[in-house]
Amino acid sequence: KWAFDIGGNGWGNNEKQFYTNADTANAIVKNGMLSIIARKERREKKEYTSARLITKGKAAWKYGRIEISAKLPPGRGLWPAAWMLCNNIETVPWPECGEIDIMEHVGYKKDSVFGTVHTGAYNHIKGTQKGKDIFIENPYTQFHTFAIEWTPEKIDFLLDEKLYNHFANEHKTSAEWPFDSPFYLLLNLAVGGNLGGQKGIDNSVFPATYQIDYVRVYQKD
């Protein structure tokens, strides 16, 4: 159900990596576990390589519980994420299409993860995004469960079953709530960028591995 986003265009965030296409140096499944590996190597004018896996065109979901079990890579400049974008992003541009960040982590904030929504009304360009962070213990040595519970009324963000961000449907317009259509999943490890690179990049941390044990989607019949 996974494909690859490919390239080194900065991805709207001034990211420093080039995302490769199904290169086992950057994405490999072993013993049922996915590893996304960022490396310090030059590729098409970028100084780093990594991978970004997407279910776009293969699978998308509307509502449900989406859960990822992962172990995060340590290091300043790293920016692992598990997130969702609307299937209609080709016709409805970001941020109007909506974005759900199930988990983001930046290496210079070792003990925090973030859960955020972006919409036309609420996004980081305006500084109005609806995000919160939560303390995380041992993110680099233990697997943790990152989840959202998404209904027509709300999106809840959970770390190891602990609720830390609640985004309610205010029943205004799609600018506030574009979350009534299918979204696809993305898993990536970025290097640098507007969020990940705020404190620079520590080149001693490469290669860096973001390990994903599973991704599960639960939906009511």
Locate each region found by the language model.
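GH16 jelly-roll
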Residues: 1-221
